[in-house]
Amino acid sequence: MINFKNHKLIFLFSIIFFSCSEEKSEFEPSDSQIPPNILLIIADDFGKDYTNGYIEGNLKPQIPAIDNLRLKGLQFNNFWSYPTCSPTRASLITGKHAFKTNVLQPGDILSTNEKTLHSYIKEIPSNNYSNAVIGKWHLSGNNNMINPQTYGLDYFAGIIGGGVQDYYNWRLNTNGAISNNREYITKTLTDMAIDWIQNQNNPWFLWMSYNAPHTPFHTPPVQMHNQGSLPDYNDNLDPKPYYIAAIEAMDFQIGRLIQSIDASKINNTLIIFIGDNGTPGMVSQSPYGRQKSKGTLFQGGINNPMFMSGFGVNRLGIDNNLINTCDIFSTILEIAGSDQYDSMDGKSFLELLEIDYEHRKFQYSEMQNGTQNSKTISNGNYKLIRKPNTDLFFDLKNDPYENNNLGVLNLNSSEKSALNELLSEIENIK
């Protein structure tokens, strides 16, 4: 296992500067005594059907920066988030399942009594991490009353609510100070991240939370995308080119961000990229479609892209382990040197960066629609979705896109055994 806590191993690398080049080179070993920088990049409403490397979907954007992370790192095929943004973010920052934080749907408020990832990292002796969240927050409700710094952040710049009405006309919150901004938001957020990183003398943890490619559909600056000359969007137009353009513009800015990191620091930086939930129904592609996309517990709503690349990622290629959102909390804590990384619902998968092993036997997600709660659990082969008035049971190995509900009656012995196992485990979680 990699010993990030003591930083006494020398790591071999297969990435150089995370540039958009496909040429493969090796990093020089970094100073093993310096705690690694951690860059967590979150894309908003970005599913597998629009991500290269996954078989879902036919339309794929040109995203060389994200591709570079994937090709020179580890691709996770079975990462589960929540169906919407706020629960995913609450689980990432607390290491808890959604029902334990009461953040079950967009706009729910994370209690200021919750201890966050940033607060845990601050308590690590001698590491002296600086931390920041730049971009979308959406854990203080929809009325923007609670400043993100209340949750243990050193620095916040971005939008507190769930999104913007206009990518070119929006309100920027910088540590509580509000200003109007008329620059393309994806670029502005990246500029602020670049400035923040360049001003750090200590190891740093940056939570880089883009609001792209979330609606509204729009036309990004032409130099940032490959969709040609798009007219202003209206409801009579196909939204897919606009959605792809926003993804490509985000990737353009991710490339800028990564390339801006000084060579002496990039050697010592771990990058994690995730989508916070599935693709919106308006643009969701086969095999998902509108009914099995964002806002649902089907795979198209919760089984999302995740890549890790850089410092300590010595195992390259594809990983098929079951990963929960809260596991990222635990993994970041262990990387940063905390001994409390498995104290919540999350389970660190740090060893997967070195070797393949069974990380966990079950994965879990849930959602609230109004006053009704639904939840789902899987063992990788079978999946159970428990709705208020019905249960859905699927054989994911033979039916990965959940087209054939097996029900709970007339099951064969293997199916009955799997169903009973999932029913038992979901009760243990609750």
Regions found by a protein language model. Give the residues of each.
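Carbohydrate-binding surface patches
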Residues: 396
